[in-house]
Protein backbone atom coordinates (compact mmCIF):
# COMPACT_ATOMS: atom_id res chain seq x y z
CA UNK A 1 0.00 0.00 0.00
CA UNK A 2 2.82 2.42 0.88
CA UNK A 3 4.34 1.66 -2.50
CA UNK A 4 1.20 2.99 -4.20
CA UNK A 5 0.73 6.05 -1.99
CA UNK A 6 4.29 7.36 -2.21
CA UNK A 7 4.31 7.85 -6.01
CA UNK A 8 0.86 9.44 -5.78
CA UNK A 9 1.99 11.84 -3.06
CA UNK A 10 5.15 12.76 -4.98
CA UNK A 11 3.18 13.38 -8.17
CA UNK A 12 0.62 15.55 -6.39
CA UNK A 13 3.41 17.57 -4.73
CA UNK A 14 5.03 18.10 -8.15
CA UNK A 15 1.71 19.25 -9.61
CA UNK A 16 1.26 21.75 -6.80
CA UNK A 17 4.81 23.03 -7.21
CA UNK A 18 4.42 23.52 -10.95
CA UNK A 19 1.23 25.49 -10.63
CA UNK A 20 2.72 28.20 -8.42
CA UNK A 21 3.97 30.63 -11.10
CA UNK A 22 0.54 32.08 -11.95
CA UNK A 23 -1.52 34.58 -10.01
CA UNK A 24 -4.38 32.07 -10.10
CA UNK A 25 -3.88 28.90 -8.11
CA UNK A 26 -7.12 27.01 -8.80
CA UNK A 27 -9.49 26.39 -11.69
CA UNK A 28 -12.08 28.38 -9.74
CA UNK A 29 -9.78 31.41 -9.82
CA UNK A 30 -9.25 30.93 -13.57
CA UNK A 31 -13.02 30.91 -13.99
CA UNK A 32 -13.37 34.01 -11.83
CA UNK A 33 -10.87 35.79 -14.09
CA UNK A 34 -12.23 34.35 -17.34
CA UNK A 35 -12.30 36.74 -20.31
CA UNK A 36 -15.60 38.63 -20.67
CA UNK A 37 -16.54 36.88 -23.91
CA UNK A 38 -16.60 33.53 -22.08
CA UNK A 39 -18.25 34.62 -18.79
CA UNK A 40 -21.67 33.31 -19.81
CA UNK A 41 -20.19 30.03 -21.04
CA UNK A 42 -18.47 28.73 -17.89
CA UNK A 43 -20.98 25.90 -17.43
CA UNK A 44 -20.57 24.85 -21.05
CA UNK A 45 -16.78 24.96 -20.75
CA UNK A 46 -16.86 22.87 -17.57
CA UNK A 47 -18.44 20.13 -19.67
CA UNK A 48 -15.30 20.01 -21.85
CA UNK A 49 -16.70 21.86 -24.84
CA UNK A 50 -13.78 22.95 -27.04
CA UNK A 51 -13.93 26.60 -28.11
CA UNK A 52 -11.57 28.40 -30.47
CA UNK A 53 -10.27 31.93 -30.11
CA UNK A 54 -7.82 34.04 -28.16
CA UNK A 55 -10.01 34.25 -25.05
CA UNK A 56 -10.31 30.47 -24.84
CA UNK A 57 -6.58 30.17 -25.50
CA UNK A 58 -6.00 32.39 -22.47
CA UNK A 59 -8.49 30.49 -20.31
CA UNK A 60 -7.11 27.05 -21.17
CA UNK A 61 -3.58 28.28 -20.54
CA UNK A 62 -4.72 29.32 -17.06
CA UNK A 63 -6.57 26.07 -16.33
CA UNK A 64 -3.91 23.68 -17.60
CA UNK A 65 -1.13 25.72 -15.99
CA UNK A 66 -2.70 25.77 -12.51
CA UNK A 67 -3.22 22.02 -12.83
CA UNK A 68 0.48 21.61 -13.62
CA UNK A 69 -0.11 20.13 -17.07
CA UNK A 70 1.52 22.97 -19.06
CA UNK A 71 4.28 25.48 -18.39
CA UNK A 72 3.72 29.25 -18.51
CA UNK A 73 4.82 29.19 -22.17
CA UNK A 74 2.20 26.58 -23.09
CA UNK A 75 4.67 23.71 -23.26
CA UNK A 76 3.26 20.36 -22.14
CA UNK A 77 4.58 18.95 -18.85
CA UNK A 78 4.57 15.48 -20.35
CA UNK A 79 5.50 13.31 -17.36
CA UNK A 80 3.16 15.11 -14.96
CA UNK A 81 0.10 14.67 -17.16
CA UNK A 82 1.07 11.13 -18.10
CA UNK A 83 1.45 10.24 -14.41
CA UNK A 84 -2.06 11.43 -13.59
CA UNK A 85 -3.51 9.75 -16.68
CA UNK A 86 -1.88 6.48 -15.61
CA UNK A 87 -3.42 6.85 -12.13
CA UNK A 88 -6.83 7.42 -13.68
CA UNK A 89 -6.57 4.78 -16.42
CA UNK A 90 -3.53 2.52 -16.02
CA UNK A 91 -4.28 0.50 -19.16
CA UNK A 92 -4.69 3.35 -21.66
CA UNK A 93 -2.10 4.25 -24.30
CA UNK A 94 -2.02 7.89 -23.26
CA UNK A 95 1.56 8.61 -24.33
CA UNK A 96 0.77 8.23 -28.03
CA UNK A 97 -2.25 10.54 -27.72
CA UNK A 98 -0.13 13.05 -25.83
CA UNK A 99 2.63 12.93 -28.43
CA UNK A 100 0.13 13.42 -31.25
CA UNK A 101 -1.53 16.42 -29.60
CA UNK A 102 1.74 17.91 -28.41
CA UNK A 103 2.95 17.83 -32.03
CA UNK A 104 -0.22 19.74 -33.01
CA UNK A 105 0.38 22.28 -30.24
CA UNK A 106 3.99 22.79 -31.34
CA UNK A 107 2.72 24.10 -34.69
CA UNK A 108 0.90 27.10 -33.19
CA UNK A 109 1.87 30.30 -31.41
CA UNK A 110 2.80 30.02 -27.73
CA UNK A 111 -0.45 31.69 -26.67
CA UNK A 112 -2.53 28.97 -28.41
CA UNK A 113 -0.56 25.86 -27.39
CA UNK A 114 -2.58 24.88 -24.32
CA UNK A 115 -5.95 25.19 -26.06
CA UNK A 116 -4.67 23.41 -29.17
CA UNK A 117 -3.43 20.52 -27.03
CA UNK A 118 -6.70 20.47 -25.04
CA UNK A 119 -8.90 20.47 -28.14
CA UNK A 120 -6.83 17.77 -29.81
CA UNK A 121 -6.71 15.59 -26.69
CA UNK A 122 -10.49 15.65 -26.33
CA UNK A 123 -10.61 13.93 -29.72
CA UNK A 124 -8.39 10.99 -28.71
CA UNK A 125 -9.03 7.63 -27.08
CA UNK A 126 -7.65 9.18 -23.88
CA UNK A 127 -10.37 11.86 -23.68
CA UNK A 128 -12.28 10.31 -20.76
CA UNK A 129 -9.09 9.71 -18.78
CA UNK A 130 -8.06 13.32 -19.47
CA UNK A 131 -11.39 14.63 -18.17
CA UNK A 132 -10.98 12.56 -15.01
CA UNK A 133 -7.37 13.72 -14.63
CA UNK A 134 -8.38 17.38 -14.93
CA UNK A 135 -11.26 16.92 -12.49
CA UNK A 136 -9.13 14.96 -10.00
CA UNK A 137 -6.32 17.51 -9.90
CA UNK A 138 -8.85 20.38 -9.81
CA UNK A 139 -10.40 18.82 -6.69
CA UNK A 140 -6.98 18.30 -5.09
CA UNK A 141 -5.88 21.89 -5.77
CA UNK A 142 -9.20 23.27 -4.50
CA UNK A 143 -8.86 21.31 -1.26
CA UNK A 144 -11.99 19.25 -1.98
CA UNK A 145 -9.89 16.07 -1.79
CA UNK A 146 -7.06 15.46 0.65
CA UNK A 147 -3.59 15.33 -0.89
CA UNK A 148 -3.15 11.60 -0.25
CA UNK A 149 -6.51 10.64 -1.74
CA UNK A 150 -6.11 8.03 -4.45
CA UNK A 151 -8.20 8.37 -7.58
CA UNK A 152 -11.77 7.06 -7.36
CA UNK A 153 -13.94 7.75 -10.42
CA UNK A 154 -17.21 7.67 -8.48
CA UNK A 155 -15.97 10.07 -5.83
CA UNK A 156 -14.48 12.47 -8.40
CA UNK A 157 -17.66 12.44 -10.49
CA UNK A 158 -19.88 13.05 -7.46
CA UNK A 159 -17.78 15.97 -6.22
CA UNK A 160 -17.60 17.54 -9.69
CA UNK A 161 -21.38 17.19 -10.03
CA UNK A 162 -21.82 19.07 -6.74
CA UNK A 163 -19.55 21.88 -7.93
CA UNK A 164 -21.15 22.07 -11.37
CA UNK A 165 -24.67 21.98 -9.91
CA UNK A 166 -23.75 24.82 -7.56
CA UNK A 167 -22.37 26.92 -10.40
CA UNK A 168 -24.81 26.07 -13.14
CA UNK A 169 -28.25 25.49 -11.61
From Swiss-Prot:
This is Short form salivary protein D7R3. The lineage of its organism: Eukaryota, Metazoa, Ecdysozoa, Arthropoda, Hexapoda. Gene3D superfamilies: Pheromone/general odorant binding protein domain. Belongs to the PBP/GOBP family. Its main location: secreted. The gene is D7r3. Residues 1-21 form the signal peptide. The keyword Signal applies. Keywords: Disulfide bond, Secreted, Signal, Vasoactive, Vasodilator. One of its GO terms (cellular component) is extracellular space. It is found in: Secreted. Serotonin binds at residues 31, 59, 118, 135, 138. It comes from the Eukaryota. Histamine binds at residues 118, 135, 138. It comes from Anopheles gambiae. Noradrenaline binds at residues 31, 46, 135, 138. GO terms for molecular function: odorant binding. Modulates blood feeding of female mosquitoes on vertebrate species by binding and sequestering different mediators involved in the host response. Binds serotonin, noradrenaline, histamine and adrenaline. Inhibits histamine-, serotonin- and noradrenaline-induced smooth muscle contraction. Exhibits vasodilating activity. Female saliva (at protein level). Female salivary gland. Low-level expression in female carcass without salivary glands. Not detected in male tissues.
Amino acid sequence: MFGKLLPCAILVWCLFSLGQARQEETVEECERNIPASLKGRVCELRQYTPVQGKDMDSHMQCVLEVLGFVEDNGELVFQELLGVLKMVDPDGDHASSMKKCNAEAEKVDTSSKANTFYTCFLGTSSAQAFKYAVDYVELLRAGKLDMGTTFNAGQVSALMKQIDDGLCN
